[in-house]
Every structure is written in structure tokens, then in C-alpha cells.
């Protein structure tokens, strides 16, 4: 990592390049940003923790044609007891919050090969009208809802 800014006889502000690993560093008063992810064994924040949000219209009636959703909070419209949404692929710890904003039940499908609660792999569960559910991936194929919804 080259030193790029001269300060007296020393240099400061080393330039970090792609692939650089920093171990045991403390960031003070700065920002860490990434287009993909930042990981650590523990993350403490003195400010807020913000989730991304989206609004999606429910579509289709099967896992194959349901509207895809992502991490964070998704407000779902257009549920009519036949339409649904599809979760992203399960990755341990992945968190999704779904708010059914419609006056009808919403089908919630896992990604292909995944399961939700104790139901059969690739089967949906039903989210009641105007309710919410927090879903957390336990491993690479299993989602659990909080509260645990009957399946």
C-alpha cells in the first residue's frame, strides 16, 4: 500500500486498493461504504440501523411467476388471495420483512429449493390481509417467520 501524501518527512493517507484487508483497525468519524457487503463478527452503531425499503405489487399464482422481493422491508400491494411474492435465496442470517398492505391474503413463496417454516420445500405460506411478517434465513435453504405462522 503506497503512501501518497507527504507530511514533513513522513507520509499519511495511504491509498487502499481493491482487495486490501485491514485487521484490527478502528474507523473514527468516517464512513464505510460498499457496493456489496461489509462483514464483521459484531457491529455496534451509535446511530440508527437503516434497512432498504421497496414497494412491490403481488403477481402470479405460483412460485415461478410471483413477484421477486429483496432484503429489507417490502410493502406489498395487489394481493387478492391468489397472487404472491417470492423471497430471495436463503443465506444464513438474511432478513426480510413483508407488509401485506392489501385487504386480502398474500402468498409468500421461497426461492426455488428453499422452504419456509415446516412446510414442504417450494411451497408457499399465507400472510393475512394487512399484516406483517419478519422472515430470517436459518441456513442456505430454510426460512423462519417471526412470529412463527401456521404453515
Which residues does each PLM region occupy?
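Intrinsic low-complexity, repeat-rich intrinsically disordered segments enriched
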Residues: 1-71, 103, 120-122
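Sequence/structural signature of small/polar-enriched beta-strand/turn repeats
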Residues: 4, 126-129, 149
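Surface-exposed loop/turn positions
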Residues: 20, 36, 72, 91-94, ...
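Residues that act as N-cap/strand-start positions at coil-to-secondary-structure junctions
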Residues: 37, 79-81, 92, 119, ...
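Exposed extracellular interaction/assembly regions and N-terminal maturation sites
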Residues: 42-112, 141-151
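Well-ordered beta-strand positions in beta-sheet-rich domains
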Residues: 84, 124-126, 133
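Extracellular beta-sheet repeat scaffolds used for adhesion and glycan interaction
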Residues: 113-123
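Extracellular disulfide-bonded cysteine-rich modules/repeats
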Residues: 129-139
Amino acid at each position: 500500500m503506497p503512501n501518497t501524501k507527504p507530511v514533513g518527512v513522513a507520509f499519511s493517507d495511504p491509498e487502499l486498493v481493491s482487495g486490501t484487508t485491514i485487521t484490527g483497525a478502528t474507523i473514527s468519524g468516517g464512513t464505510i461504504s460498499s457496493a456489496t457487503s461489509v462483514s464483521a463478527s459484531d457491529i455496534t452503531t451509535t446511530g440508527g440501523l437503516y434497512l432498504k425499503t421497496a414497494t412491490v405489487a403481488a403477481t402470479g399464482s405460483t412460485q415461478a411467476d410471483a413477484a421477486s422481493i429483496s432484503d429489507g422491508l417490502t410493502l406489498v400491494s395487489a394481493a387478492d388471495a391468489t397472487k404472491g411474492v417470492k423471497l430471495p435465496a436463503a443465506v444464513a442470517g438474511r432478513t426480510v420483512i413483508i407488509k401485506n398492505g392489501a385487504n386480502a391474503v398474500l402468498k409468500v413463496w421461497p426461492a426455488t429449493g428453499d422452504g419456509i417454516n415446516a412446510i414442504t420445500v417450494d411451497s408457499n405460506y399465507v400472510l393475512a390481509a394487512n399484516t406483517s411478517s419478519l422472515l430470517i434465513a436459518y441456513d442456505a435453504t430454510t426460512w423462519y417467520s417471526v412470529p412463527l405462522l401456521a404453515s
